[in-house]
Each structure stands twice: as C-alpha cells, then as structure tokens.
Amino acid sequence: MNPLLLETINDLPPLPKTVIELQEYVDSSGADLEISKVVAIISKDPLLIGELLRLANSPFYGFSHQVSTIQQVVSLLGVSNIKNVILANSIKSNFSIDVSPYGLDTAFFLTNCSNEVDFISTWLHEEDKHLANELVPCAMLLRLGMILLANMLIKSGKDKEFLNQNKEQNFQNVSELENQYCGIDHVSFLGTLFDHWKFDERLIQSIAHIENPHAASQEIKKNAYALAVTNCLFEPYHPLSPFNSKKSIALINEATNQGIDFNMGNFLAKLPQTAKDNLMKDND
C-alpha cells in the first residue's frame, strides 16, 4: 500500500467512545441484543442524542410525526440502521474539507453531497423505505474517499501537480490519476474505509460494487444499483448533466434486466428538475 495512504488511514481520528461502545455491543450481541441497552448506551452522550433526533426529524427519513425520544428513533429505524447512521454522522463531522486538488469548488461540492443524500431518501422513501434507511449512511459518506485523497495530496505537496494533470486531461481520467498519485481511486478507498470502521458487511459490499453493480450478489444488488444511480446522477464534475441523467436511466433499465425491481415512473417523478430538463437535451 502507498505509504501516504497507509499514513492517512492510521491518522484517521478515533471514533467517540459512545460510538465504539454501541458498535461493539451491537456487533457482539447477535440474537441476544436488547433495545433497552442500545438506548442506555446512546443516552450516555447528550450530543449524540441531539444529533440522532435532528437526523430522525430531517427530510432524510420523512417520518410523518415528530420524533422526540431515543426510544422512538431506535424503534423506527432499527438497531442496525441506528448503528450505521451514528457511525456515518460521527465520521462525517471529523474532517476539514478542501477539494481544490480536484479543481472543484468546495462549497459547490458540499451542496452536491447534501443533494445526494436528499435524493436517495426522496427517491426510495415510498418505494422501498427499508432500503432508503439502509443507504442513508452510504450516501452521507459517498464522497469521503475523494475528501481524504484531496487531504493526502495537499499534505504530500502534490496537489498542484495532480490538479494540473487533471486539467490537461479535461478531468476525464480522475480515477487513473488517483491510482497514479495515491495508489487507489476514491471509490475503492471508500470501501476500504467502510471496512476499517467496521460498517455492516452489506454496506461494505454495496459500496464495493458502486461501479459494477451487475457483479454484486443478489442479496445486495439493489443496494449497489441504487448507489450506482445516485453516484452517476451527482457525479461531482457534472451533476445532473444530460449525459449523467440519461446514464442513470440506463442503470435503472440494466437493474430491471438483472431482476431488480425499481419503479421507473417513481424514479422519473423524483428526479431533480434540472435532471428532468436535461433528459430532453443532447449529451454534453
């Protein structure tokens, strides 16, 4: 492994004590897991309680009534989803973000990241609520690999060189450049990070198949296609472009041919207006 990459992983900030305790309890309890103990662990951390209630009442989950207690959150989302979203939110809060090595405006990039989570929640909320809830943590961290590789490039002093090569190639070969400079591309790195933080294996495998969802096992193929569609639509350089909007529909059709049930009418209805407009235009 690239020494700088290894250093980046080793230097990742530790997870908060409460998050680690919850993760260890859920992962070790199996069928003996008790909801009351999950609630007791979370209740030790007032900041975590506040953040969970904020997330539960956000548009990500779309509950029809105000959620006011941790017991309600755990009951509504389930223990596994709670563990994963707590992990994702804790990780997301730990990093300074500067994606200038990619030639991207950081504020625009962060807005796009937020839109990804909003979309996957809105798209799947009525069609497959369980899937929507399961994938929110993945969507929250979808661009984390890019964020950390950007930090690594800045730290190593190679950010300007990387950016110049990226510009020379018109930002068309980002993954190849990432492999050249960092020894890994940002999507593969995200899978490595999910494994490092011990996310559920279903989420690790879903992330691992974002770019080849057809190769995913049947058990997580719908997860992989949903993430692949979101990744395509909100591709950081050209989010919602004519090409990416049409490619997302091609992915839905591919999923259908693979025996995965997505409602095309619902997908088209939930597309952002920019994507709907761009479906009528020629590709970039």
Q: What spans do the regions from the language model cover?
A:
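Terminal helices and disordered tails flanking the catalytic cores of nucleotide-processing hydrolases
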Residues: 1-4, 254-284
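Divalent-cation-assisted or electrostatically stabilized phosphate/pyrophosphate-binding catalytic cores
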Residues: 72, 159-189, 216-217, 221-224, ...
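Cytosolic terminal low-complexity segments enriched in Ser/Thr and acidic residues
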Residues: 245-248, 254
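Conserved alpha-helical "signature site"
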Residues: 1-155, 181-183, 188-245, 284
